[in-house]
């Protein structure tokens, strides 16, 4: 048991497996129904903070819509772990018949952050209930603006990304059976980067195309050439 960064009584470790599923379900459905884009998660942040206050959990605001909370156990053994969830949604119109589908036109929790936030709230609720049964401190990060890639910066600027022993973050996967946790020694997910290419042409009379530069044709060729790059730059095994 001493290998755990938080030290629980043995029966409480088992009890931690039984979080309030109904609370988690209701929270997830509320968040799914009220999605907000990166940096605009005001209602989401208010919902999270209201629940933390109900549970008696101390927290501080991070930026306008991020939230950082902490739960101290019965004894401060100097050990800290960080649990993190993202909270923002995507600019996608939801086309489902769910009873709790998005009420915000053009915005949807299509990446599962509603589940992440609800799960962390459920964990926070349970940890608050067994607070007297563990030693150490649990830190909770409800991170805004993950989709735009700058949400963590607010936590960094406030010095909240140091001083803990381990950090845990999860992401749901619809192709993984319910109740299964997947761990990987290597990267298990990916993100995308954006870049812009500008092709500048030069006009010419149709009778003298050789005096011009056809940006459209160059663009068509470029698309095909870019598609070849991975096979030429990366090993086949990757």
Which ranges hold each PLM region?
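Histidine/acidic-residue-rich, glycine-tolerant segments that coordinate divalent metal ions
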Residues: 90, 97-108, 115, 132-238
């Amino acid at each position: 048991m001493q290998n755990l960064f938080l030290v629980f009584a043995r029966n409480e470790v088992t009890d931690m497996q039984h979080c309030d599923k109904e609370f988690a379900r209701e929270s997830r459905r509320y968040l799914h129904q009220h999605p907000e884009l990166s940096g605009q998660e005001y209602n989401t942040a208010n919902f999270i903070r209201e629940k933390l206050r109900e549970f008696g959990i101390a927290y501080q605001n991070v930026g306008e819509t991020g939230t950082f909370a902490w739960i101290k156990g019965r004894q401060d053994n100097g050990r800290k772990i960080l649990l993190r969830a993202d909270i923002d949604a995507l600019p996608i119109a939801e086309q489902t018949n769910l009873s709790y589908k998005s009420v915000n036109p053009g915005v949807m929790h299509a990446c599962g952050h509603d589940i992440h936030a609800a799960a962390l709230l459920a964990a926070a609720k349970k940890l608050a209930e067994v607070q007297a049964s563990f030693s150490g401190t649990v830190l909770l990060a409800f991170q805004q603006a993950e989709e735009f890639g700058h949400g963590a910066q607010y936590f960094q600027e406030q010095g909240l990304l140091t001083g803990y022993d381990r950090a845990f973050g999860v992401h749901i996967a619809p192709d993984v059976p319910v109740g299964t946790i997947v761990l990987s020694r290597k990267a298990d997910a990916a993100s995308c980067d954006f870049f812009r290419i500008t092709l500048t042409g030069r006009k010419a009379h149709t009778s003298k195309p050789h005096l011009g530069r056809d940006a459209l044709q160059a663009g068509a060729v470029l698309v095909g050439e870019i598609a070849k790059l991975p096979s030429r730059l990366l090993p086949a095994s990757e």
